Curated annotation (Swiss-Prot):
A Pfam match: Gemini_AL2
Annotated region (Disordered), positions in chain: 77-117
Task of the protein: Multifunctional protein that modulates host antiviral defenses and promotes host attractiveness to insect vectors. Acts as a suppressor of RNA-mediated gene silencing, also known as post-transcriptional gene silencing (PTGS), a mechanism of plant viral defense that limits the accumulation of viral RNAs. TrAP suppresses the host RNA silencing by inhibiting adenosine kinase 2 (ADK2), a kinase involved in a general methylation pathway. Also suppresses the host basal defense by interacting with and inhibiting SNF1 kinase, a key regulator of cell metabolism implicated in innate antiviral defense.
Any one GO MF annotation of this record: DNA binding
Assembly and binders: Monomer. Homodimer. Homooligomer. Self-interaction correlates with nuclear localization and efficient activation of transcription. Monomers suppress local silencing by interacting with and inactivating host adenosine kinase 2 (ADK2) in the cytoplasm. Interacts with and inhibits host SNF1 kinase. Binds to ssDNA. May interact with host RPS27A.
Record family assignment: Belongs to the geminiviridae transcriptional activator protein family.
Biased composition (Polar residues): 77-87, 101-115
Record's GO cellular component terms: host cell cytoplasm; host cell nucleus; viral capsid
Post-translational modification: Phosphorylated.
InterPro entries the UniProt entry points to: Gemini_AL2
Official protein name in the record: Transcriptional activator protein
Zinc finger (unnamed): 37-54
Primary residence: host cell
Length: 135
């Protein structure tokens, strides 16, 4: 069937399946980091100043240290090629506590807002109990 438009340059949107296939073919820019315990992880090259704890040791990807491989079987040489801008500010946040234990709310003896309309447990009838058990 011939197109209804006389124009020869028809523009159509690329389907999402084709876009996904193209995106999957793009190489992932990441580096492999080997830990002292023998484990390794892959770090995206645009990711810096994020850390995690593994087997009791804290690891931080500062971005200043990168691996330059000399060959197949040679050890990696660590070099400091640049300084990345700091991604996390040092400002204190609302959840920052210098001590490890977070303060707990005090328990009260009065009615809470949630249970303020409940009747006294002594006033609950047998039919109320059977209804609650059926739930």
């Amino acid at each position: 069937m011939q197109p209804s438009s006389p124009s020869t340059s028809h523009c159509s949107q690329v389907s999402i399946k084709v876009q996904h296939k193209i995106a999957k073919k793009k190489p992932i820019r990441r580096k492999r980091v080997d830990l002292d315990c023998g484990c390794s992880y892959y770090l995206h090259l645009n990711c810096n100043n994020h850390g995690f704890t593994h087997r009791g040791t804290h690891h931080c990807s500062s971005g200043r240290e990168w691996r330059f491989y000399l060959g197949d079987k040679q050890s990696p040489l660590f070099q400091d090629n640049r300084t990345q801008p700091e991604a996390i500010s040092n400002e204190p946040r609302h959840h920052f506590h210098s001590d490890k234990i977070q303060p707990q709310h005090q328990e009260g003896n009065g009615d809470s807002q949630m249970f303020s309309r409940l009747p006294n447990l002594d006033d609950i009838t047998a039919s109320d109990w059977s209804f609650l058990k059926s739930i």
